[in-house]
């Protein structure tokens, strides 16, 4: 089984979501399913079929979150050097062709969020940034095509999800 790095914040988020599904969402859905079952004819009972489908989806989510947790390796980015890009590093870079600046933080897959500038360590850009330092130029091959970036700064910034 391949291990997946994640921050403690990411791990806590996943375990909280799992806890909510197991202790709140699933029991409430089981009750709704039982109540719908008591309404009679199950063939034409929309409430029953809806609750049954919802329970199935919740069980799938629980299984997926359990799989994430079983593969998790918690890494504390504060213990890593950030003079070069590594897990948990925040990187300021500029597209040398357009002068557009970007800031990304490298995190675990379940923590990634494009809107927040948090990219998975497995993403094409993160893989190519690893080990680089401020001042380096990077010819990145990305799904949208090739881009050239200059790394302006590599540092640690507290990760908030």
UniProtKB/Swiss-Prot annotation:
<keyword id="KW-0175">Coiled coil</keyword>
<dbReference type="InterPro" id="IPR023459">
    <property type="entry name" value="Tscrpt_elong_fac_GreA/B_fam"/>
</dbReference>
<dbReference type="GO" id="GO:0006354">
    <property type="term" value="P:DNA-templated transcription elongation"/>
</dbReference>
<dbReference type="GO" id="GO:0032784">
    <property type="term" value="P:regulation of DNA-templated transcription elongation"/>
</dbReference>
<dbReference type="GO" id="GO:0070063">
    <property type="term" value="F:RNA polymerase binding"/>
</dbReference>
<dbReference type="InterPro" id="IPR036805">
    <property type="entry name" value="Tscrpt_elong_fac_GreA/B_N_sf"/>
</dbReference>
<dbReference type="GO" id="GO:0003677">
    <property type="term" value="F:DNA binding"/>
</dbReference>
<keyword id="KW-0238">DNA-binding</keyword>
<dbReference type="InterPro" id="IPR006359">
    <property type="entry name" value="Tscrpt_elong_fac_GreA"/>
</dbReference>
<dbReference type="InterPro" id="IPR001437">
    <property type="entry name" value="Tscrpt_elong_fac_GreA/B_C"/>
</dbReference>
<dbReference type="InterPro" id="IPR036953">
    <property type="entry name" value="GreA/GreB_C_sf"/>
</dbReference>
<protein>
    <recommendedName>
        <fullName>Transcription elongation factor GreA</fullName>
    </recommendedName>
</protein>
<dbReference type="InterPro" id="IPR028624">
    <property type="entry name" value="Tscrpt_elong_fac_GreA/B"/>
</dbReference>
<feature type="coiled-coil region">
    <location>
        <begin position="45"/>
        <end position="72"/>
    </location>
</feature>
<comment type="similarity">
    <text>Belongs to the GreA/GreB family.</text>
</comment>
<dbReference type="InterPro" id="IPR022691">
    <property type="entry name" value="Tscrpt_elong_fac_GreA/B_N"/>
</dbReference>
<dbReference type="Pfam" id="PF03449">
    <property type="entry name" value="GreA_GreB_N"/>
</dbReference>
<keyword id="KW-0805">Transcription regulation</keyword>
<dbReference type="Pfam" id="PF01272">
    <property type="entry name" value="GreA_GreB"/>
</dbReference>
<keyword id="KW-0804">Transcription</keyword>
<comment type="function">
    <text>Necessary for efficient RNA polymerase transcription elongation past template-encoded arresting sites. The arresting sites in DNA have the property of trapping a certain fraction of elongating RNA polymerases that pass through, resulting in locked ternary complexes. Cleavage of the nascent transcript by cleavage factors such as GreA or GreB allows the resumption of elongation from the new 3'terminus. GreA releases sequences of 2 to 3 nucleotides.</text>
</comment>
């Amino acid at each position: 089984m391949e291990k997946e790095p994640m921050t403690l914040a990411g791990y806590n988020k996943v375990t909280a979501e799992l806890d909510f599904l197991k202790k709140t969402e699933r029991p409430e859905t089981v009750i709704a399913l039982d109540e719908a079952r008591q309404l009679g004819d199950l063939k034409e009972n929309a409430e029953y079929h809806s609750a049954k489908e919802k329970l199935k989806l919740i069980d799938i989510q629980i299984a997926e979150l359990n799989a994430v947790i079983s593969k998790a390796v918690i890494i504390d980015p504060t213990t890593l050097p950030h003079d070069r890009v590594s897990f948990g590093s925040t990187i300021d870079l500029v597209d040398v062709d357009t002068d557009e600046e970007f800031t990304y933080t490298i995190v675990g897959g379940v923590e990634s969020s494009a809107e927040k500038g948090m990219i998975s360590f497995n993403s094409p850009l993160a893989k190519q940034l690893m080990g680089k330092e401020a001042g380096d130029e990077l010819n990145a091959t990305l799904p949208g095509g090739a881009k050239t970036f200059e790394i302006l700064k590599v540092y640690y910034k507290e990760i908030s999800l």
